[in-house]
Amino acid sequence: MKLRRSVEKLKGTIRVPGDKSISHRSIIFGSLAKGVTRFHNILRGEDVLSTMQVFRDLGVKIEDNGDIVEVHGVGFDGLQAPKNDLDMGNSGTSIRLISGVLAGQDFEATMFGDDSLSKRPMDRVTIPLSQMGLKISGQTERDLPPLTIKGNKNLKPIRYQLPVASAQVKSALIFAALQAEGNSVIVKKDLTRNHTEDMIVQFGGQLKFNGKEIRIQGGQEFIAQEITVPGDISSAAFWLVAGLIIPGSKIVLENVGINETRTGILDVIKAMGGKMTLSNIDELAKSATITVETSELKATEIAGELIPRLIDELPIITLLATQAHGTTIICDAEELKVKETDCIQVVADALNSMGATIEPTEDGMIIHGPTALHGAEINTFGDHRIGMMTAIAALLAKDGEVVLERAEAINTSYPAFFEHLNSLMD
């Protein structure tokens, strides 16, 4: 796919699609609640559609009426054994979170995915889940998919210290703990996105927090709700960066989720001196309108507890850093190596081929800026983030064509991406 390059400016207003993390969890909680839950602005990206289909295969009635998705919840006890293996597509979120849901069921199921997902280790989930009394196994010592799980209706509670800051592992254990007999305790390493915890409360459940400890009582039931999903800050990130680095630009993003565990990119933009304002802040919905304008940017350091709050945005933040004055250092981001690709190497290779100066490290990157960009041929390797990052980078390319291979990966999280990009050029 040939990408549009070297635009003069980007101007306009965009309402980004519903948050992917919240959309996944919406389908899960709606299925596990009793009654009909109605969701507005749910994402229809391929990953979320995978989660939706899996719960249909588990016996849940889900109706997509365009603006509204209705989930006819059956509770933990109402899920049915699937007739076939469960297809997770490319979604690491789906396979990890649903592992926790299936942990307390009295049937066996096998979960598989595409070639990319089949290379992603699942042992971070399988090891602690196995300690709760179920049987779960994958391929090789790292438990690559397919995963086969034989649940246990009499799950043992667990006390588990998370070895890494992973919201997916934490959430899988929470879903299992909700089905266990007694109290489970999960000890967090660092702050991670807390959508699962928030939604437990939204659906009438309870959690107790003590510092980095989360205490979960087993045997809880959830009540159907009506919920509006805020816009995905991970999707908004591409427009935030575009508005900051494309000359003469001003972009307004409406209804963007600003959950404090996800706003690391906003902290980075402030540290770099970007022109950004938040308005129409809704404290209850944790959303706001964000406006950005072309800015003179300075380098910064991105590390430590900031990393889990922007892990999915690091590819586009790397592009941002190529246009900042000075040397930006990203470290403590080894989690990027086990995304759809080795994201550290793939991002560095892609942007370097376009003229950037990036040194990949074991746990991050060193980015020297500002640098002019030019045309190149880039492969997404099936990673939607790489695709959208490249599309924004192409807007700065002065010479040569930018050709994107496997551009269809963008549909994983943002099917309307190019439509929205074109609207900013009009």
Curated annotation (Swiss-Prot):
Tell me what reaction this enzyme catalyses.
3-phosphoshikimate + phosphoenolpyruvate = 5-O-(1-carboxyvinyl)-3-phosphoshikimate + phosphate
Question: What subcellular compartments does it reside in?
Answer: Cytoplasm
- Supply the SUPFAM superfamilies for this chain: EPT/RTPC-like
EC number of the protein: 2.5.1.19
Keyword Metal-binding listed? The answer is no
- Listed GO molecular functions? 3-phosphoshikimate 1-carboxyvinyltransferase activity
Keyword match Transferase: yes
Q: What class of enzyme is it?
A: transferase
**Pathway of action:** Metabolic intermediate biosynthesis; chorismate biosynthesis; chorismate from D-erythrose 4-phosphate and phosphoenolpyruvate: step 6/7
List the CDD domains. EPSP_synthase (cd01556)
So where does 3-phosphoshikimate get bound? 20-21, 25, 166, 168, 312, 339
Among HAMAP family, the record links this protein to: EPSP_synth
- NCBIfam families, per database record: aroA
Assembly state and interactors? Monomer.
Write out the similarity annotation.
Answer: Belongs to the EPSP synthase family.
State what this protein does. Catalyzes the transfer of the enolpyruvyl moiety of phosphoenolpyruvate (PEP) to the 5-hydroxyl of shikimate-3-phosphate (S3P) to produce enolpyruvyl shikimate-3-phosphate and inorganic phosphate.
Name under which the protein is recorded? 3-phosphoshikimate 1-carboxyvinyltransferase
Q: Which organism is it from?
A: Streptococcus suis (strain 98HAH33)
Q: What is the lineage of its organism?
A: Bacteria, Bacillati, Bacillota, Bacilli, Lactobacillales
